[in-house]
UniProtKB/Swiss-Prot annotation:
The keyword RNA-binding applies. This is Translation initiation factor IF-1. It holds the Pfam family eIF-1a. Component of the 30S ribosomal translation pre-initiation complex which assembles on the 30S ribosome in the order IF-2 and IF-3, IF-1 and N-formylmethionyl-tRNA(fMet); mRNA recruitment can occur at any time during PIC assembly. It comes from Jannaschia sp. (strain CCS1). One of its GO terms (molecular function) is rRNA binding.
Length: 72
């Protein structure tokens, strides 16, 4: 079975939550809970409130996501 295509959305980090999770507001106005991707953790890329990020989400659960890029 092939993997489902991930949905990618730009957003802004609104709040830092425990356990390396974040509340992210997407450009379309929705707020989701997102965690950092493994490569970002490995390379110690810091994400702070107010950062512009790219979030990928599965089409099955649109309330959770993964931050895979922090814009400069």
């Amino acid at each position: 079975m092939a993997k489902e295509e991930m949905l990618e959305f730009p957003g802004v980090v609104k709040e830092l939550l425990p356990n390396a999770t974040f509340r992210v507001e997407l450009e379309n106005g929705h707020e989701i809970i997102a965690h950092t991707a493994g490569k970002m953790r490995k390379n110690r890329i810091r994400v702070l409130a107010g950062d512009k990020v790219q979030v990928e989400m599965t089409p099955y659960d649109l309330t959770k996501g993964r931050i895979n890029y922090r814009f400069k």
